[in-house]
Amino acid sequence: MMRIDYFKLSFEKCLIVMMVIMMTSFSCGRDDVKTSLKLASQNRCELEKVLSHYKIERDYEKLKAAEFLIKYMPWQRSYSVDISNYYDAVDSVLAVTSERDAFKSAMKRVYEESEKHLRIDSDIQTITADYLISEIDAAFNQWRNGKWARHLDFDEFCNYLLPYKCIANQPLDDWRERLSNLARGDIDRRERECKDYQYDSKSAAISVNASMSGNYMKYTKQLEQYPIFRPETILKLPYGTCIESCIAAIQIQRSKGIPVSLDFTPQWPNRKYGHYWLSVLGLNHKSVPFVPFDIESGVLENRILSKVFRMTYNPNRELARRVRKGLRIPSSLEYIFCQDVTAEYTTADDVEVKLFSNGRISDNIYIATFNNQTWIPVDWGEKKGGRKALFHALGRNVLYMPVQCTEMHECESVGYPFFLDSRGNVTYIPICSDNKEDVCLYRKYPVYAFVYKNSAMIRGGVLDISDKSDFSNSTTFAVFPSDSLTLAGAVSSVDAAGRFVKFKSSNEGRCDMAELIFYNEEGVRLSPALIKCGREVHPNNKVNLATAINDDDPLTFFSARGEDDIWVGFDFGKKVKVSQVDYFRRSDGNNLYPGYEYSLAWWNGYTWELIDTITADKSLCFNAKQVPSGVLLLLTCLTTGTESRPFVYNGGNIIWY
C-alpha cells in the first residue's frame, strides 16, 4: 500500500482546521444538522429542500438518513465533475501506452497538464437537492428492495450503502447508476437458480470480484499522486497499487447494492508500507475480507496486524477532536474518515504502558511500529496520570513504541519500545545496557515466506573446474549446502586450479543462483568472462538469464537445471588457483554483499545511535566489538536498498521484530 496524498484528511489540512473550528459545537443530534445548514451558506436552501422533501413524503427513515449525511457533510469535499476531462486524457494515454517507463512519463505529463483545471469543492456548499435526493432514494431502493443488503440494520445501511460517495474526494457523479451493470458476473443467475445464494451478499461480492479478475495491475507506486476515481479508467491501468483497485472495486460493488467496505492497515508491523483491501458484510453480520480483482481467498492469512481501520462517511470522533484542537496528526493517520475494526481481524488488547519519567509529554500521544526505516504511528492513545498512556485494541506479536507529535510536525519517542507477544504480555526493550558483547551479522532482514517458498530451487549446486572449455576433464571442487537453507556464504580453502569453472545443479531439478564471486590465493577478486551453455530456463525473463550470475546484482539470478542440461561457465583467461567462492542464492538481497557499505546502530530511546560503519568484504559478515546487549539494533545498507528490521542480539541469537 501507498499512503495516498490526494485524499488524506480529504482536503488540505489548513482548510480543515479553519472549518472545524467553526464546528466545535457539534454534538450528536439535530443541532449538528442546524450547524451544517449554517455552514452551507448560500447552498442552505438546497439542503432544506431535501429535508422538506422527506418530511412531506412522511418517510422518516429517509429523513433520518438525510440528516445523517448532512450532519457530517461539512467535513466532505469532492473533485468537481470537470475532472472527467482529466480521466478522458488518461484513457487516451492508456489506449496507446503500456510499457512501464513510457506509461509513467505519459501519466505524469497528462496530470501536470490537467492539474490547474482540477477543482476541489466543499460538498456542503455545492451539492444539489436533486442529486442528494436521487442518491438517498437509490440507496434505500437497494436496501429495501434489493437482494444483497436486506440483512443490514439502519446503522449498517448508513455505513455501507447510504453515502453518496465511497471515498473522500470522490466526484459527485452518477457512479451508482452508471456502474450498476458493470462486472455483474453471474450474481443474478446464481441468486435466481440457487436458494443458497439468495440474498447472500458474500456470494454476490465474490461473483462480482471474479468477473473483474482479469483486470490485474502490475505493482508500481508511481500512481500515488494521481486522483483517479473513475472505475472505467482504473480498470484499464496496466500498473497501480492496492488503493487504485479498491477505489474502483468498492464503487462497482456498492452500485449493485452489495454492502462492501474499504479496510486498511496504515502500516504492516513487520514490512514497509501498509495495505488496502475490501470486506463484505455477510448474512451473519460479520465482515469477510477479499482482494479486488483476485479470486484467491486468504487475503490476510498468517499476516501479523497491528491496527486495522474501515473507511466511513463520518469522521472518526477522536481524530476529529484532535483536528478541532489544532493538534498535529501524523501523515499515516490523516485519513480521518475511519473506524477501528482491529478486533474483527485479530486478537487485540488494551495496553497501558509507562512513559519516560523526564521531559515534556503532550496529550497528542500515538503508538508506532517500524516500517523498515523509521517509526510510523498506527493509532492514537490516551495520556493517563503517573506518566502512563493507554492504547486500545493493539494487535499481538508486534513491536510498538509510544510517540508524540510535536508542534514542529515531528514524531518523537516518549517511552520504551515494547513487544506485545502472542499471549498479550508486554515486554519492554531496554534503551541502555551495561553488558556488552561482540556481534557477527550476516543479514539485515529476516527470511520471510516470499523467499522461503523458493527453497526447493535455492539448495544444492556444484562447481566443476577444468583446463578445457568442454569440461571433459573436470573435477568437482565445491558443493553448496543442500540440507539447509543458506542464502549466502563462502566456500573457502578449496585449493582448486584450472582455467574454466562450471556451475550446475546438483540433480535434475532447478538451482537458482544470483552471484558467484571467485578469489585467488592472495584474496584478490577474480573477473572471469562468462561461458553460456546456449540455453536458459526462461530466455525472455531478464532476471534469470546466464548473465545475471556475474552482474554484481544480488537481486537478479540465473537458473541452472539438471546436471548437464542448463548450466553456466566462467573463463578466467588462464589457469588460476581459486581459494574461495562467495555465493549468493536467489533471495531478497539482504545478505551482506562485498563492496557495499553498512552501518550498525542501536536505539538509545530517542534515535538510532551509530555503533560502526564498514564496507563488506569477502567474509560477508559485519563484526562489531562491545555492542550493548539486549537493546534494539538496526543494520542498514548505505549503498542500496531500503529493507532493514530491528532486532535484539543476545548470546549469538537474533530476535527479529
Model-derived segments and their meaning:
Residues M1-V33:
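Bacterial Sec-dependent N-terminal signal peptides
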Residues V33-S41, H53-I56, R192-S211, K221-S331:
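Hydrophobic/aromatic-rich core segments of domains that either
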Residues K38, K49, R58-L237, Y273:
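Secondary-structure boundary elements
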Residues D349-G359, K444:
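A short, amphipathic beta-strand motif
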Residues N364-E382, L463-K468, S472-A478, W602:
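Short amphipathic beta-strand segments in non-cytosolic proteins
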Residues G386-M408, D495, Q626-S629:
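Short Pro-Gly-centered beta-turn/loop motif in secreted/extracellular proteins
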Residues T406-D434, F518, F647-Y657:
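Structured interaction patches on ligand/partner-binding surfaces of diverse proteins
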Residues N435-T475, S482-Y657:
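Aromatic, loop-rich ligand-recognition surfaces of beta-strand-rich domains
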